[in-house]
Amino acid sequence: MSALRNYLNKIKPNFQKGGKLHAFESVFDGFESFLYVPNTTAKSGASIHDSIDSKRIMSFVVIALIPALLFGMYNVGYQNFKAAGTLDTASFIEVFGFGFLAVLPKLLVSYIVGLGIEFAWAQWKHEEIQEGYLVSGIIIPLIIPISTPLWMLALACAFAVIFCKEIFGGTGMNIFNVAVGARMFLFFSYPLAMSGDKVWVAKDAIFGLGNTLPDGFTAATPLGQLAQGSMPSASLCDSIIGFIPGCIGETSVIAIAIDAIILLWTGIASWKTMGSVFAGGIVMALIFQALGMTPIAWYEHIVLGGFCFGAVFMATDPVTSARTEKGKYFYGFIIGAIAVIVRVMNPGYPEGMMLAIFFGNMFAPLIDYCVVQSNISRRAKRAIK
């Protein structure tokens, strides 16, 4: 690493003002700050709250995503071999290797397109490159079906980065979660590629691994089966472990629980927001079940679909979620409740977490405003007394 540090110091003058490559200063600073702590200090007094800066936050979230990512890769291979009837004779390496080769291109496209736009935008605006897309670049591939074409994913990443992030001012200024923006773009632009029973299992062999399935092969998700009024073919145990069709990173409750522990232990995610999402979903599910409006049990709403993934990774986004302590409770509860409302009231769209987080992001500033104004009014009355 010292050799790399010395090399960067050697070429750095070329990218500084007056250097031959000054036009690419933002790109160089982006790579340098990604590898090392930036060589800058505050010129005036600074208030340091803790040692966690934005780069460390992003790094911890990326680490927390690894269990869901790795299990998602394995499950992609698992579903392919299971559909072909060759799961019993396949080795772990074959199953995971197929899933790895199927998911890797989506990760590469997400990062190449998203970071490419971020680099170009920083060059155009003469700004520093931010680390925010390091997390979004993994989340976006994890919340789409495995059969999503790469060109659709590229369009979604471009739309999300430009219209959900950069036009608001970049990292820390966006009001909508970038991954939610990408998912909504895909769902409303290409609904047939994001729903139904033909998009959840990879159907083509890759470099000799996996199986080529018939074009007419279908595999519905358990949540989709429940929405159609039939019992899911997968057991509750398989649903919790994650051996079910679904979006790449959303199937395993156990993997997501490990992710949640990491985020809560590091203090990056708020337990108030995360817990309130689950509370809102459970309360609303119990209400609908008591009224006889749905046969789906409350725990099925939690373990199926993208509820857990959305509650852990997307609802807790510190930029787009509510920031006041009381507001976090209302914000999370609203998201959980809306997710179940959409699932029950709209059978044609069994997954409601995406819209729930979108509306939660929309109302987060209003929630914070109401909480702050309530505190001001209460203190004013106390002062008068």
Give each language-model segment a name.
Residues E128-L209:
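Membrane-interface helix-loop-helix junctions at boundaries between adjacent transmembrane segments
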Residues A154, I175-V180, W298-G306, K328-F330, ...:
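Loop-to-transmembrane alpha-helix initiation sites
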Residues M274-E325:
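A beta-strand-loop signature enriched in Asp, Gly, Thr, and Trp
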Residues V113-E118, Y133-L142, C157-C164, I254-I262, ...:
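Hydrophobic, membrane-inserted alpha-helices
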Residues M1-L107, A383:
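N-terminal signal-anchor module of multipass membrane proteins
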Residues A42-I48, G114-K125, I162-G172, I258-T266, ...:
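C-terminal ends of transmembrane helices
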Residues F96-S110, S147-A156, S239-V253, P295-F307:
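Structural signature of hydrophobic alpha-helical transmembrane segments
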Residues G172-A257:
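Long hydrophobic alpha-helical segments that form multi-pass transmembrane helix bundles
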